[in-house]
A protein has these predicted regions:
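TPR alpha-solenoid repeat register
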Residues: 3, 37, 71, 105, ...
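Residue-level recognition of tetratricopeptide repeat
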Residues: 9, 43, 77, 115, ...
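Register position in tetratricopeptide repeats
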Residues: 13, 47-48, 81, 112, ...
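Structural marker of alpha-solenoid helical repeat scaffolds
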Residues: 30, 63-65, 98-102, 136, ...
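Terminal, low-structured helical/coil segments at or just beyond the last alpha-helical repeat
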Residues: 230-280
Length: 280
């Protein structure tokens, strides 16, 4: 059985998903490693684009091996990726109920459920889960960054958000998304000059990410570097045009910034204007 699992895993790592799926299916249902094989088969199905079949495999596994937290958490991950956030939350609920109070993985479950709540629009439940994850793993950079960035986007608790993101950067200094968050919270706080270096570093780390390039454009605009801002906004648009990248960047808003400038866009949105004298 170990040889079958090893072979299937190797085939999957080589992108031979159909062959991997076939090998995973050779593990008998009465074998103690059956759930491992089925989790592998579901992953191979998902990676081959067969999300619905992957979900079917995992749902069947919840019926045959429902006492295992990993089965429910994996189902939650796939449902969340499929944007079935309500279903993902239910799966994570079950995983959290089953996981030992002392299990190191519990923070991951709260973090994952927090993302599902956030994507479903429940900011209160989302924050509660992120804080539960931090209670278990206080310096986890992904959680610190996600919660900090969420608060920045909601324009609240900015000082706490800055502290969280600074801790995240200290723990993971080469993560472009986390460095971007630090630059962005400084921008939101009106500390534009301080934001420049962090945003430039984020673009170095994530050169083709449209959101990061858009953010750098906004920061450049705020410090009076209009031509460089327009260049970054055009870069952001070009990376969005190259494919169906899942991104929070709004191409229409970027085009409007290119047409009338960031100040005018903020005014039309009823958002706070950029601060004058921002070296604070």
């Amino acid at each position: 059985i170990d040889a079958l699992l090893l072979t299937a895993g190797l085939l999957e790592s080589l992108g031979q998903f159909d062959l991997a799926i076939a090998v995973y299916r050779d593990v008998p249902a009465d074998d103690p490693a059956y759930h491992v094989a089925e989790l592998g088969r579901a992953d191979a199905l998902r990676r081959s684009g067969e999300e619905e079949k992957a979900i079917e495999v995992l749902e069947q596994l919840t019926r045959s091996h429902g006492a295992l937290a990993v089965v429910h958490s994996t189902l939650g991950d796939v449902l969340r990726a499929d944007e079935d956030f309500a279903g993902a939350i239910l799966a994570y609920n079950k995983a959290i109920d089953l996981a030992s109070e002392k299990a190191p993985v519990r923070w991951v479950l709260y973090y994952s459920r927090g993302i599902a709540h956030e994507r479903a629009g429940d900011e209160v439940a989302s924050e509660a889960d992120f804080r539960a994850a931090l209670a278990i793993n206080p310096d986890q950079p992904q959680v610190l960054n996600y919660l900090g960035y969420s608060m920045v986007e909601q324009q609240r608790n900015l000082d706490e958000a800055l502290d969280m993101i600074e801790r995240a950067v200290a723990a993971s200094p080469d993560s472009g998304y986390i460095v971007d968050s630090l630059g962005w919270v400084l921008f939101r706080l009106g500390r534009y000059q301080e934001a420049v270096g962090h945003m430039e570093r984020a673009v170095e780390l994530l050169a083709v990410d449209p959101v990061v390039n858009d953010h750098l454009g906004d920061v450049y605009w705020a410090v009076g570097r209009a031509r460089e801002a327009e260049f970054q906004w055009r870069r952001a648009l070009s990376f969005m045009d190259r494919g169906s990248m899942d991104t929070e960047a709004d191409p229409d808003r970027i085009r409007l910034k290119l047409e009338v400038g960031l100040d005018q866009v903020l005014e039309e949105e009823g958002a706070p204007s950029l601060k004058v004298g921002n070296d604070i």
